[in-house]
A protein has these predicted regions:
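Conserved acidic donor-binding segment of nucleotide-sugar-dependent glycosyltransferases
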Residues: 330-343, 350-355
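Short hydrophobic beta-strand element within catalytic cores of glycosyltransferases
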Residues: 315-319
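Donor nucleotide-sugar binding/catalytic pocket of nucleotide-sugar-dependent glycosyltransferases
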Residues: 56, 139-142, 162-206
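N-terminal strand-loop element at the rim of the active site
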Residues: 6-13, 26, 30-91, 188
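A conserved mid-protein helix/loop that constitutes part of the nucleotide-sugar donor-binding site
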Residues: 17-22, 219-242, 256-262
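A charged, aromatic-enriched C-terminal amphipathic alpha-helix characteristic of glycosyltransferases
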Residues: 15, 337, 354-380
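Membrane-proximal helix-turn-helix segments that form the acceptor-binding/catalytic region
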Residues: 103-109, 149-169, 187
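Aromatic "clamp/platform" in nucleotide-sugar-dependent glycosyltransferases that forms part
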Residues: 279, 298
């Protein structure tokens, strides 16, 4: 039986972390022996749906610090590299982090057997172990690259993280961004493949039936995302106010922008219609009961929430942002895309709310079925 290992920094509530869990489940459903390892504990971790997925915790930072070299490199990075270069802490952490991970993997394989495929999800994960190299490993890039400023620093980082590695982009938009980065920062991956995120239709549709008394009984607009600048909630609030719709707007998620968004809702005189629902361990009932799901991000590597909302039978509207949203909203769904501006998004909301809730077609989700994604990872 083929054995797989998905590696993620933590199992906190977040899109990338949820995808890591979904991928581990997809490997299990495909008949593989599936393992999932995380580096940092959180109070309420995400869990795989299938009990057959074996979850492991490697306290990477603590073990790194137990080695004299690892502790010294962390101190050096904190006191020297980070102040000089900015965001360079991983250069120190990842040297011994990779050694610690390789040692853990060796012991893991002594107990469970040789791993056939290792999948690292997210740059934040493989930053912590960047010195680790293995031909069985695939490194998944979840988002597009940004090219403003500090090109020499970014070139150094890119050579540490991406050079001569087998990379996987979650969308063609991310892959195109990587190719531009290759030219600017002078690195060359061993390979680059596009594999979309899995959408576990069956488990989503089971989870969406869960009762939740906090969900409004009346129709509402919905956004599910961390409240951070990249998700563009300021644009969403302004467009929502401009649309003049009487339906409430529900924001599921939390983050650093919450206070400023509450203040903006008050400034726009829509505070009585905007519901800040906070983090929800199960967002799918909220998606199921929504009249319209609205995405307002500045960029999205894939936009997993779009096909999660579609899986729940809810119509979607998205701004046309850099990344992978066009790979979800294609064909008949292209009408769900609008220009990323306050006026266009407001007009899109108004148009989308006209008439009955539209039917969602099953074939729109075919590219993201877990069995296809699992097979794509082990085939390369």
């Amino acid at each position: 039986m083929m054995r797989t290992l998905v590696v993620v920094r933590s199992l906190k509530m977040g899109g990338m972390e949820r995808v890591a869990v979904n991928l581990a489940d997809a490997f299990h459903e495909a008949g593989y022996e599936s393992h999932l390892v995380h580096f940092r504990k959180v109070k309420r971790p995400l869990r795989p749906e299938h009990s057959g997925v074996k979850v492991h915790h490697l306290p990477l930072q603590q073990r790194n610090r137990l080695t004299l070299v690892g502790y010294g490199l962390e101190v050096l990075a904190r006191l020297l590299l980070n102040p000089l270069m900015g965001r360079a802490l991983f250069l120190g952490l990842g040297v011994m982090g990779g050694v610690v991970f390789r040692h853990w993997l060796k012991r893991f394989e002594q107990e469970h057997g040789r791993v056939d495929r290792i999948v690292f999800r997210g740059i934040g994960t493989f930053e912590l172990v960047w010195s680790f190299r293995d031909r069985r490993a695939r490194y998944v890039l979840e988002n597009i690259f940004h090219f403003n400023g500090a090109s020499r620093r970014k070139a150094l980082f890119a050579r540490c993280l991406y050079h001569r590695r087998d990379l996987v982009a979650v969308s063609q938009g991310v892959a195109d961004s990587l190719r531009k980065a290759q030219t600017l920062w002078k690195f060359r991956p061993r390979s680059l493949t596009v594999i979309p995120n899995p959408c576990p239709l069956r488990s989503i549709r089971e989870a969406m039936l869960e009762a939740n008394d906090a969900i409004p009984s009346e129709p509402y607009l919905l956004n599910v995302a961390r409240l951070v600048p990249a998700k563009g909630h300021d644009l969403l609030l302004r467009a929502y106010a401009r649309s003049g719709t009487s339906l409430p707007l529900v924001l599921v998620g939390d983050g650093q922008e919450r206070d400023s968004l509450v203040a903006l809702a008050n400034e726009l005189d829509i505070a009585d219609k905007v519901i800040f629902a906070g983090n929800q361990y199960n967002p799918y009932p909220w998606m199921r009961h929504a009249r319209l799901f609205v995405l307002s991000s500045r960029f999205e590597g894939m936009g997993i929430v779009l096909f999660e909302a579609l899986a729940c039978g809810t119509a979607v509207l998205s701004v046309d942002c850099p990344g992978g949203v066009r790979e979800i909203l294609k064909g008949e769904l292209e009408t769900s895309l609008v220009e990323r501006s306050e006026e266009a998004l407001a007009d899109g909301i108004t148009a989308a709310l006209e008439g009955p809730k539209p039917e969602v077609r099953e074939q729109w989700l075919d590219d993201f079925r877990p069995e296809r994604v699992a097979q794509a990872f082990v085939a390369r």
